[in-house]
Amino acid sequence: MPRISLSEVMTKFPLTVQAEDPVIEVQDIFEEYSIHHIPVLSEDKQVVGIVSKTDIDQLSWGISLFANPNRESYNEALMHTRRVKDIMTKNVYTLDVDDSIEDAYSVFRSEDFRAIPVLENGDLVGIVTPIDLVKPFITN
């Protein structure tokens, strides 16, 4: 079987957010684009984290445990005041665009990641998920 590089299967140039962005902006992106992970960039465009739909769900889910009649308005205020840096996963593992799908598979097996940013010369050029790794093997 020929070697398949991540450049062949990754989502190219994914949507990104910055660490200082309010969480509500990320929530809006998740809803509008039906995606589940967004790389977080610093002001100088370096990957500093990743935020997932689960991160946002956990933020609001904790509030919903309380029988508070103002829960919805509190959740709304929380989404506007919390920053991405407060909920993102830091110290994200990254892969290189020339790495193979086998390399990515090894990372997904050994770590608890559901998406990995893909870099080329230190710049974000894509994101890969476990689903992306099986695409070359699915025939129509």
Question: Where are each of the predicted segments found?
Answer:
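A glycine-centered beta-loop-beta connector
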Residues: F30, I38-D55, F108, I116-D132
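Short, charged/polar low-complexity linear motifs in solvent-exposed/disordered segments
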Residues: S34-H36, D44, L65-N68, E76-A77, ...
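Tandem CBS (Bateman) regulatory domains
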Residues: M1-F13, S52-Y93, Y105-R109, T129-N140
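Short, flexible active-site loop motifs that bind/organize anionic cofactors or intermediates
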Residues: F13-T16, Q46, T94, D123-L124
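The conserved cystathionine-beta-synthase
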Residues: V17-I35, V40-S42, M88, T94-D112, ...
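A generic helix-loop boundary/linker signal
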Residues: T16, E20, Q46, Y74-L78
